[in-house]
Each structure stands twice: as structure tokens, then as C-alpha cells.
Amino acid sequence: MLAKYSSTRDMLDADGDTTMSLHSQASATSQRPELGHTEHQRPSSAWRPVALILLTLCLVLLIGLAALGLVFFQFYQLSNTQQDSILQKEEKLGNLSRQLQSLRTQNRKLAETLHHVAEKLCRELYNKTGEHRCSPCPEKWKWHGDKCYQFYKESKSWQGCEYFCIAENSTMLKINTQEVLEFAMPQSYSEFFYSYWTGLSRNSSGKAWLWMDGTPYSSELFDVMIDLTSLRSRDCVTILNGKAFSKDCRELRRCACEKAAAMVKVQSLHEPLSRRWR
């Protein structure tokens, strides 16, 4: 009986072991998926902080881009405003420049008109008295047209008169227009036969007559009476009693000089004569 019990216990033990072994296997089998699920969930929980950080960085980047866009927009508006302001200022400057140019033109025209009126008035006063404080010429010089003339009593050679006129800041007389001819020839009348050198000369009898500035002589204005009694290397022209004569340049004759007249100034019409020649 003991042997039967022992065999039965052994069988129970064997069955128990078998049962326990099966239970253990079942338990182990049922627990494996839980372990796998746990291992599968661990990486997800580890990426959460990283994802949060990346999301935060993205938000910061978006905010930065938005701020940068706002700054760029403000700068763009400011640039457009400044550009409009510059264009407006340039337009105003252009208008002012045109107005200034117009005023300068008007001022120049007024100055020219004033000069013509003053010159006309001064010339009328000068023609009445022969000399007036408004005259644009130096003292004792004759005003005619736009030139001042002086007929000196000193007698010199032609070259001597050239140097004399240069010393007076002038040149020798030049008769190149009918108006000057009608003015200069009456000045040459003299009861003592004093003639005046002009700036007309030529190197030899075959050469053309030239004025000192190189312009040619016009025979349509006046004729030059040639002296054929002697041969000379250089001929110079004098005027006497309304006629022109060819003479030896070394002869002594009076000097006739001319210079450009100064502009008639309005204030000179009100200055005393004695004050003008100080």
C-alpha cells in the first residue's frame, strides 16, 4: 500500500510538475508580450523631450521670421517714404532752380534795359556839353559809339605812337566803318597841317595794307594817297584834312589812340563832375 501511495504521489508530483511546468510556460508566454510592449514604449517616451525641444525651436524660428518680416516691412515702408520725400525735394529743388534761372534772365534783361536807358541819357547829356560826369571814357577822351578816342598833340614816329598808345592802355586809331570814318576825319582838320598816325601800314609797296590787329584795309571806305617820290621798306598812313596819306613811318606825326568805352553806370549820373575825376 505504501508502494501504491508512493507511486500515486510520484504520479501527482509528476503531474504537478507537469502542471506547474505548463503553468510556468503559459505564464512566461503571457508575460512576454508585456515585456515587448514595455520595451516598445520606452523609445517613445525618450523622444518626447526631443520633439518638444524641436517644436520650441520651430516656434522660436517662426517668431523670429515673423519679427524679421515685420522689420523688413517697416524698413520697406520707411524706404518708400524717404524715396518719396527725396523725389519731392528734388522736384522742389528743380522748381526753385527754374525760378532762379527765370529771375536771373529777368534781372539780366532789366540790367540791359537800364544800361541802354542810362547810355542814351548819358549820350544826350554828353552831346550837349561835350563832356559829362556820366561819360564812360577817361577825362579828355572823346566818346563815340562804343569807343573812346584821343588825339594827342605829341609828335612821334609811327612806332613811337604805337608804344605811346599801349602805355595809355589803348591801340592806334582804326578806321574800319563808315561811322568811325565820319567821326575821325573831321578830327584831322588843322590849320597848321598836323596829321595823325593811324594803325594802318604795309611792309612794302607790293604788300596789302593791314591794320594793327591784322584785319585788311577796305578801299571802299577811303583811298590812300601814295607818295611815289621815294621808295621805302615800310609805309604808314596818316590822316590830314579828311584825307589819308602814305608816309614814311619814321616821320614825326601826332598820335591818335582808341580804347573800348566802359559801361555807363546809373549812379554816375548823380555824381558831381569833380568827384568823378578824383
From Swiss-Prot:
Extracellular side: 74-278
Biased composition (Polar residues): 18-32
Region (Disordered) location: 1-42
Record carries keyword Glycoprotein: yes
Listed Gene3D superfamilies: Mannose-Binding Protein A, subunit A (3.10.100.10)
Annotated GO CC locations: plasma membrane
Subcellular location, record wording: Membrane
A molecular function GO annotation: transmembrane signaling receptor activity
GO biological process assignments: signal transduction
Cysteines joined through disulfide linkages: 165-257, 236-249
Domain C-type lectin: 144-258
Record: glycosylation sites: 95, 169
Residue stretches spanning the membrane: 53-73
Residue intervals annotated with topology Cytoplasmic: 1-52
UniProt membrane topology term: Single-pass type II membrane protein
Annotated Pfam families: Lectin_C (PF00059)
Keyword line: Disulfide bond, Glycoprotein, Lectin, Membrane, Signal-anchor, Transmembrane, Transmembrane helix
Record's protein name: C-type lectin domain family 1 member A
Native source organism of the sequence: Bos taurus (Bovine)
Gene: CLEC1A
